[in-house]
Amino acid sequence: MPAVTFTVLKRDRSTGARLGRLTTPHGTIETPVFMPVGTQATVKTMTPEEVAGLGAEIILANTYHLYLRPGADIIREAGGLHRFMHWERPILTDSGGFQVFSLADLREISDEGVTFRSHLDGSIHFLGPAESMAVQEALGSDIAMAFDECVAYPASPEEVAAGVERTSRWAEACLRAHRREDQAVFGIIQGGTIPELRRRSAREITALDFPGYGIGGLSVGEPKELMYSILEELQGYLPENKPRYLMGVGSPDCLIEGVKRGVDMFDCVLPTRIARNGTVMTTYGKLVVRNAAYARDFRPLDPECDCYTCRNYTRAYIRHLLKAEEILGLRLTTIHNLHFLIKLMQRLRQAIAEGRLEEVAADFYERYNSGKI
């Protein structure tokens, strides 16, 4: 029996949106879904129980960071990532490829993998398809991602083509190396913003018959409209019966537009990162609660939100906490932002089920862009 199964429950008539169900060894996920990011085996400032209490059905953890610290062997000895961090629901791990190419001091890229210098202590490491699979098997995630080359944006067509070729070879190597039967491996489609190379990558990666597919190399600085056009381009090249995961995307508008274009899964550090900087998402747009304008504002962050933060605390109090550098301020803004996106995905799922996605999306945009904060 496969480690994961995916069922499309309903398709939207006017868009490419799908309502689905993804079953994993640690539970079932209703899609489309947003996955909070727990880079270091923790969603920053929150306990796993709190994250689950918000309705998060799956989280993401980072292979690169956990490989460097505390090390895959320690997590294996602990019984895997679920036991190590006390999270009983599904976990997806990325391959480490994006961080190797973006964070680490690259030493050498070869067909076998990447030699790099750790951003923590300068030590030299090698990570390739086999190594990435070994680390992710030790972590014991429900879904592992194939090791890929994420080419920076902008890049020349030659650089993007080389990345597509290497990503395809590495995808095959990942399948050869992977052994764990209770863990699925998703392939990753690259190709930058060049439609021809996206189509080529999609053909080559889907030919390997992974149980799911990540769409990588987007949301890296390209205009949003360009990302949307690439998603539209890919719809006809991805299997209808397998989940589609848009990597690193988490703003409300991108979630809605991704769902319309057939995406089932999303992850991003955005909601938690901007929360720690004092920015929150509300029904009527983004609110920078650190600003002096809110020093005497005794309303909740979002009067229409029912999260723990908005039920109990005011903008003035949260601003005070942030200015005083109190940890509670970071926790309260994080709770709110994650609640906001998880509730948004719940509304989108309900809208697909009821055949009202376009209507619900239009209503969201009208209010979110109104500026009535």
Curated annotation (Swiss-Prot):
Gene3D superfamilies: Queuine tRNA-ribosyltransferase-like. Residues 248-254, 272-276 are annotated as: RNA binding. It catalyses: 7-aminomethyl-7-carbaguanine + guanosine(34) in tRNA = 7-aminomethyl-7-carbaguanosine(34) in tRNA + guanine. Substrate binds at residues 94-98, 148, 190, 217. SUPFAM superfamilies: tRNA-guanine transglycosylase. One of its GO terms (cellular component) is cytosol. InterPro entries: ArchSynthase1/Queuine_TRR, TGT, TGT-like_sf, tRNA_ribo_trans-like. One of its GO terms (molecular function) is tRNA-guanosine(34) queuine transglycosylase activity. Zn(2+) binds at residues 305, 307, 310, 336. It holds the Pfam family TGT. Its EC number is 2.4.2.29. Signal peptide: none annotated. Binds 1 zinc ion per subunit. One of its GO terms (biological process) is queuosine biosynthetic process. Keywords: Glycosyltransferase, Metal-binding, Queuosine biosynthesis, Transferase, tRNA processing, Zinc. The keyword Metal-binding applies. Homodimer. Within each dimer, one monomer is responsible for RNA recognition and catalysis, while the other monomer binds to the replacement base PreQ1. Belongs to the queuine tRNA-ribosyltransferase family. Catalyzes the base-exchange of a guanine (G) residue with the queuine precursor 7-aminomethyl-7-deazaguanine (PreQ1) at position 34 (anticodon wobble position) in tRNAs with GU(N) anticodons (tRNA-Asp, -Asn, -His and -Tyr). Catalysis occurs through a double-displacement mechanism. The nucleophile active site attacks the C1' of nucleotide 34 to detach the guanine base from the RNA, forming a covalent enzyme-RNA intermediate. The proton acceptor active site deprotonates the incoming PreQ1, allowing a nucleophilic attack on the C1' of the ribose to form the product. This is Queuine tRNA-ribosyltransferase. It comes from Moorella thermoacetica (strain ATCC 39073 / JCM 9320). The gene is tgt.
